[in-house]
Every structure is written in structure tokens, then in C-alpha cells.
Regions:
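Conserved lysine of the Walker
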Residues: 15
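The conserved Walker
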Residues: 11
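N-terminal phosphate/diphosphate-binding loop that engages ATP/GTP or pyrophosphate donors
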Residues: 24-73
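Hydrophobic positions on the alpha1 helix immediately C-terminal to the Walker A/P-loop
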Residues: 18, 22
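Phosphate-binding/switch loop-helix module in NTP-utilizing enzymes
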Residues: 69-129
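Walker A (P-loop) ATP-phosphate-binding motif of ABC ATPase nucleotide-binding domains
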Residues: 4
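Hydrophobic anchor at the beta1->P-loop junction of P-loop NTPases
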Residues: 7
């Protein structure tokens, strides 16, 4: 069975940094696909998040601090669900199909399974389906996420769960790498 890794931790605990370290490490020996959600900052203040493909130049806004009509809202953020749905359909689902039969040389990275991303029903369905495949997955999940997808994933027998913090980031990196050797 291919490794399925979930990484959790409070905001600013280094989850996304750990994912970046892992994509950089695995890129040389594996076919990797997926996305990161880098913070967007202006004048040292976070103004939003982007979706950034890890194997192409695709990048677009996931959320911005603004009131925009016809968007989902999470706190001060407007979330661009339609753009994310298009990304899932036109990029992620196609990339997984292009892999053909998933094998040990493929890894899917998902940063993150969180409240903003789960405004997309398509994303929830994608997550439920992809975790059923024999495919290696490394994903972050919101620590305080109260959504049925969290309990679904945490109850899968093949899940290897890590809770990170800045202090133990390197140790977790090493443990995750061991899962692939």
C-alpha cells in the first residue's frame, strides 16, 4: 500500500514550509503533482492565499481580504470557489488520469485540506476518491477543522498522521521520508 501522510498543526506551525521542503526533496526521484497555498502579503500583512501548482506555472487567487460579491466568505476573506473547482477539474483530475495506474513513483501533494478549500464540494469529492486509490499522498489538514472529511481521513487504516510545530519540523520531515524508503 502506498503511503498516505496527513500533517496537521496550528496556524503558523510550519505545515506549508514542511510541504515545500518535501516537494523539493521528492521532486528529483518521483513524479509529483498537487498544490501549495502560499500566503500573499502586502506591507507585511497577510492579504490572502494563492493556489500554486507544484509541477507547472499555474497560480491563481484562492482567497483575498476583501468583500467580493458572489464569493464564499471565511472571516475577512472572500474565497474564489469557482476558480478552485476549475483547477481541480482541469488540472488535478487530469494529472491523476495522466498517471494511468498510480504507482510508487507518483506522489500527490495537497496543501491544504482546510475550511477555504472545502467550500468546494468538488474538492471534498476529489479528496474522498483519491484517498481510496493506491497512490502516495502527502497532505496538510487544518488542526481545528470540524468537517466530516477530517474524521473520514483520520479513520482510514493506512493514514500516517503527524502534528507539526516549528521545533520538530526537521524530525517530521525525516520521519516522512522514511515512509518512502
Amino acid at each position: 500500500m502506498s503511503p498516505k501522510i496527513l500533517i496537521s498543526g496550528p496556524p503558523r506551525s510550519g505545515k506549508s514550509t514542511l510541504m515545500k521542503m518535501l516537494t523539493d526533496y521528492f521532486r528529483k526521484d518521483y513524479s509529483i503533482v498537487g498544490f501549495l497555498t502560499p500566503e500573499i502579503r502586502k506591507n507585511n500583512k497577510r492579504i490572502g492565499f494563492d493556489i500554486k501548482s507544484i509541477d507547472s506555472t499555474i497560480r491563481f487567487p484562492l482567497a483575498r481580504k476583501a468583500t467580493i460579491v458572489d464569493t464564499h466568505r471565511l472571516g475577512d476573506y472572500s474565497v474564489f470557489v469557482e476558480k478552485f473547482n476549475n483547477f481541480i477539474e482541469e488540472y488535478l483530475e487530469n494529472k491523476i488520469r495522466d498517471f494511468g495506474t498510480p504507482n510508487e513513483s507518483h506522489i500527490l501533494f495537497i496543501d491544504e485540506i482546510g475550511k477555504m478549500e472545502l467550500f468546494s464540494n468538488r474538492f471534498e469529492i476529489f479528496i474522498r476518491n483519491i484517498f481510496r486509490l493506491d497512490m502516495s499522498i502527502i497532505a496538510t489538514i487544518g488542526k481545528n477543522l470540524s468537517h466530516s472529511i477530517r474524521s473520514y481521513l483520520m479513520n482510514l487504516p493506512e493514514i500516517c498522521f503527524f502534528e507539526t510545530s516549528i521545533d520538530i519540523q526537521r524530525d517530521i520531515f525525516n520521519e516522512i521520508v522514511k515512509n518512502f524508503s
